[in-house]
Amino acid sequence: MERRRTSGWEETGDIFIAGIDVGFTGAISFYHHHPDRKRLVMEVYDMPVIKIKKGKKTSQEIDESVLRQIFAAHKLTHVFIEKAQTMSDQGISSAGRYMCGFGILRGICVGMQVPYTLVRPQQWKKIMMSGMSKGKGQSIVRVKQLFPLQDLPLKSDHGKADAILIACYGAKEMGY
């Protein structure tokens, strides 16, 4: 089935690629490149989450409505989603919510007819962090090398940094 958009992005040549670091502390980054102006803009959003109170406990879930609004505000060419994997120290319900969020992201892409690619962390890190340690803090260092004006002041901004690097990896994979 051929995918068509009538919003005008084909005529401008703009490229919009999203990179997503899955999880409640993850983020969504948008790589926007306009070839004629040789301009690159990076936008980054925290993963939209809602807190749900169940008795005395509070849990988090991805806010699908806000996520869809964020996607709809960008005329996406392609989305690169970090392939979710549960960790051995994660509890069952935490792992379930994490994987549910991963499924929501894929479902929104399918529902909005935006092509997506799942990318293992080792894949994008090998390309984007070549010659560097692959620790969480290192992705912030790498983003600051590539985008000196990008503001990532907190150690907890590693999700944003990962999303930016995933979007850049996606752009490289697509030849931009």
List the predicted regions and their residue ranges:
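Phosphate- and other anionic-substrate recognition elements at nucleic-acid/protein interfaces
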Residues: 1-176
